[in-house]
Structures are given as C-alpha cells and as structure tokens.
Regions:
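A residue-level marker of the well-folded mature domains of exported/periplasmic proteins
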Residues: 1-100
C-alpha cells in the first residue's frame, strides 16, 4: 500500500507469480506488459500478440531464405510465456502449420 498508485509487471513465470499478482491486485490497480499472466486478476495485458509475432518472423525468414538453409534460434528465457508463444509461432510458420 503506502503511496503506490498502481503496478505494471512483465511476468517471468505466470504459474509461480499469479498468487502474488492477485494479492497485489487486491490493493492497487495492476497490469501486465510484454509477458502476461492470463489467469491472474490483472486489469489488462499490454503487449505484443506473441504467437502472431513469431509467425511474422517466420514469414520474413522464409522470404529472405527462399532456398531454405540452416537457422539457429536463440531464446533468452525459454520458460517465459512470451518466449514460448513467439517460438511456437515461428516454428509453426516455418513448418507451414495452420495458425492457432
């Protein structure tokens, strides 16, 4: 409480942080940004549609490498929700899978 008027958080691990987010959201307005905790009591999520962003990256890669080739994917934090969603979108696009 105190002088805090609100909280904006980029969630590292929604499964482990949702309880804390819900506790804080009971006292002040709380939003998530960049990486979400969709099952929390946050007011809203502000950020990229991460799965679609991954698909768009896949389209650019296919356009820039029309003959195919080798590709290395680096993900900073593989278990973070936004990373998972972006990676899934990229891999689905590269494999020509239908969008989710």
């Amino acid at each position: 409480k105190g002088d805090c008027k609100g909280i904006a958080i980029s969630v590292l691990n929604p499964e482990n942080q949702t309880e804390m987010i819900n506790y804080a959201a009971g006292s002040v307005p709380l939003i998530t940004h960049d990486s979400d905790a969709p099952d929390s009591n946050r007011l809203f999520f502000l950020g990229t549609e991460n799965y679609q962003a991954g698909r768009e990256l896949g389209k650019l890669i296919k356009k820039s490498m029309p003959e195919g080739g080798k590709l290395m994917l680096y993900v900073g934090k593989i278990d973070q929700l936004n990373s998972i969603q972006r990676r899934d979108g990229l891999l689905d696009e590269l494999a020509d899978k239908p969008a989710k």
